[in-house]
Amino acid sequence: MFKKLLFIGTLLISACTKVEDVPLPVTTSNETALNFYKQALVHVSQGEWPEGRESFQSALRIDPNFVMANLYGWTNDPVQNRKYRETAAANKDKASEAERIMVEMWQAGREGKSDKRLELAKELVEKYPSSSEAYVELGNMLREKYNFDESIKSYEKAIEINPDSYDAWQALAQ
């Protein structure tokens, strides 16, 4: 009887202590643009690249200063792609802290500063410890540095927060 009560108590405690996955904040002036952006992320995660590209572009037609859509969006025109990234960088300080960090991670990567990227990914996790996305980003940066054991731990933490994190599961499978 005591074992059953202990087991039930443990289940109740673990159910009550479940961490809610908090998405990284995204700033846009328009709800429809946000919906296109979210749709683009789903398309890209499923390998539907043309649909993802179109959804990012739809978001940018509605809100041309949408930082994350500018950071992640692309076209077949490299000049336009550069303009997207420049717009993201120019507007990063008007966006959320998470968006600023993500843009700075991209900038550091473009400049070949992998240590800075890792430092920024750790900052993202410190500021957003309940976000599976933050742990996936950290895992990606650790993997980039060939620190595979730590990257696996980061992906596992993302899965602990969100057992349905496609990006974390996909990264672990690589």
Spans of features found by a protein language model:
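Helix-start (N-cap) detector for alpha-helical repeat units in TPR-like alpha-solenoids
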Residues: 26, 33-34, 67-68, 98, ...
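Short coil turns that delineate tetratricopeptide repeat
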Residues: 30-31, 64, 93-96, 129-130, ...
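Conserved structural position within tetratricopeptide repeats
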Residues: 58-61, 90-93, 125-126, 156-161
